[in-house]
Amino acid sequence: MMSDEDNTYSDDEEWLDLDLGLPNNDIKTAPILNSSLLSSAVHGERLIQERPTHDFGDVEATVDRTVEKRSRLKITSVDRKIRLQIHQLHLLCLTYHLCTRNTWCDDNRLNYLVKYIPPGIRVSLHPSSQKSQMIRNKTFLHGLAGLVEVWKRKYKITTNGLRKPNYGLLQNNSLISESLSLEEFCKNSKLLSGSRDYGTQLFASILRNLNVPTRLVFSLQVLSFRFKGAINEASSHEIVPAWSQQMENDSSSDISESAHITSRFRKRRKIIQPSFSNLSHLDASDIVTEDTKLKVIDSPKPVFWVEAFNKAMQKWVCVDPFGDASVIGKYRRFEPASSDHLNQMTYVFAIEANGYVKDVTRKYCLHYYKILKNRVEIFPFGKAWMNRIFSKIGKPRDFYNDMDAIEDAELLRLEQSEGIPRNIQDLKDHPLFVLERHLKKNQAIKTGKSCGRINTKNGVELVYPRKYVSNGFSAEHWYRKGRIIKPGAQPLKHVKNGDKVLPLYDEEATQLYTPKPVVANIVPKNAYGNIDLYVPSMLPYGAYHCRKRCALAAAKFLEIDYAKAVVGFDFQRKYSKPKLEGVVVSKRYEEAIDLIAEEIDQEEKEAEARNVRKTCLLLWKRLITGLRIRQRVFEEYG
């Protein structure tokens, strides 16, 4: 039989590959560096041992490196739980960041920014209601485009904004976005320079001061709860900051141009400072300022942008203050590419001036169910958790208006109109569709017709709705859920469990377990003298489950028949230990066992209190005796 630990029936174990470096037969040369920077560590252990030898005649340095084997760490359920909790906490922190910056955008000290906007643009943002709908819409969009062009000329991007974080790399304080207080937020606005995120927030403040209903939109760059690619993030995309390059130049120039390092270690790393994100991709927007000569590397797609309400069309219009005017109102142009390592679109929240937050992710992503696998809603509790969050920060239903109803209808239409993905990778873990190859070990397609086909290198494969997928479990698993296999029921499928073949059954092949009743005040027991009580329905007819702390002592005191209740199992170090909770007795003794259990519990608490008082008195006696001895010693011997 299979234990509860095998109920997931995963096809493969998950592992983290730690690339500790593999030797390469090629001999490489490089400028000499400080030897203290040539070692790396994982979990605090040094993985590279160096034995440098120096001959300053011709200045030659030889470094031998002893390389350990490639290490593999198994991913446990605790690791997954920790990452999920980090994901949830990071999501809440970024949401709070959005709410805070949105409040700062409404500060009165930013009202002066309106003076940079020409009068013609101000008029275009408020077209006359006497004109036709088409003209008002065109005039409003023209005003937004002019405002974007003015703001791009006025504001200079000098620092990095928020980027996609990675687990594999530590935070680099020189590369993260600016950290501002409210005073600095308002004061720095006079400089008209900073990160792209900061400039977008000032742009939202300008629109609101121009009496244009504006929402600040934030694509939350949340740490993922998945492990796939976690190590690649740490080693594949590395950068060389300015201080590291300078150290390299200084070291090589101080000794000699002929200095070199002979290494039997493959050429794969530069000396780097750990960073908070990957900055080595050429598809990012590189901006070099004239004042600081600082290279600002940002994703081509924004993390912050704004939505301005178009009264003519009664809908929100998306605007990137530092993008091209052609993307105004085109939601899908804001989604970053899947190869963009600086920006990911998982959660997109929009916040109004009144502080109400709304999830508008469906509006900006082409395939919502493709990114759903990276959201917390993919878990059974995820949707309820998100609803609980938005019940605090979302707009109450009582405050809904026509434009909210129109937007909700549009989001629902986008969700329902999404079709079958075109590639196999997107179909994996898809919440609506499934391929037979992606089924878990305990899953099978029992009934139902296919809803589509997809071409693969092995031919044509059928696509099925996920609602037709049935989960099969062993008879032992169903028994622990209070169900047994129906007589003559056929298994859903058979799987190998060691040398045996284990049949798996779906819920339709099971029925509710009916335990034997209590007869003559005798409780039915299993082979171990206990009673299985995994769910309340497994309690026998005529029995009573006493969960009080002293229930066992009370049953022994009354000298009645009882059975210890096994309510589950604790799995520790690959061994299962039954979890006992109270006793089961005849319902006839319910009142008596409750009363006796409470009395015994009270007596034990009183006895424990007496022991505590006795121990305290003994300790006080010891302390006072010691003080008396100390005083006598000082009096007699000074």
From Swiss-Prot:
One Pfam family hit: BHD_3
Protein location: Nucleus
GO biological process terms held by the UniProt record: mismatch repair; nucleotide-excision repair
Record's keyword terms, sorted: DNA damage, DNA repair, DNA-binding, Nucleus
Highest taxon above the source species: Eukaryota
GO molecular function, one term: single-stranded DNA binding
Major place of residence: nucleus
Annotated Gene Ontology cellular component terms: cytoplasm; mitotic spindle; nucleotide-excision repair factor 2 complex; nucleus; XPC complex
Coiled coil regions in record: none
Its job: Has a role in the nucleotide excision repair (NER) pathway. Acts in both transcription-coupled repair (TCR) which removes damage from the transcribed strand of active genes and in global genome repair (GGR) which removes damage in untranscribed DNA. Involved in the repair of UV-induced damages where it is involved in the removal of cyclobutane pyrimidine dimers (CPDs).
Family under the similarity heading: Belongs to the XPC family.
Protein's name in the database: DNA repair protein rhp41
Organism lineage string: Eukaryota, Fungi, Dikarya, Ascomycota, Taphrinomycotina
